[in-house]
Amino acid sequence: MDIRLIIVLMPILMAASWAIYNIGKALVGQFGKMLNE
């Protein structure tokens, strides 16, 4: 694996994992509201 490729992919992977984390958190919050009502 080329080090330059890792340097380029690193921020993309971090942004993708951050987006997935935020979407997951939002979904859990929505399900929590639905269950409470």
Curated annotation (Swiss-Prot):
Residues 24-37 are stromal. InterPro entries: PSII_PsbY. The keyword Chloroplast applies. One of its GO terms (cellular component) is chloroplast thylakoid membrane. The chain crosses the membrane at residues 5-23. One of its GO terms (biological process) is photosynthesis. Its main location: plastid. One of its GO terms (molecular function) is manganese ion binding. Residues 1-4 are lumenal. It is a single-pass membrane protein. It is found in: Plastid, Chloroplast thylakoid membrane. The keyword Disulfide bond does not apply. It comes from the Eukaryota. Keywords: Chloroplast, Membrane, Photosynthesis, Photosystem II, Plastid, Thylakoid, Transmembrane, Transmembrane helix. PSII is composed of 1 copy each of membrane proteins PsbA, PsbB, PsbC, PsbD, PsbE, PsbF, PsbH, PsbI, PsbJ, PsbK, PsbL, PsbM, PsbT, PsbY, PsbZ, Psb30/Ycf12, at least 3 peripheral proteins of the oxygen-evolving complex and a large number of cofactors. It forms dimeric complexes. NCBIfam families: PRK13240.1. Loosely associated component of the core of photosystem II (PSII), it is not always seen in crystals. PSII is a light-driven water plastoquinone oxidoreductase, using light energy to abstract electrons from H(2)O, generating a proton gradient subsequently used for ATP formation. Belongs to the PsbY family. HAMAP family: PSII_PsbY. This is Photosystem II reaction center protein Y.
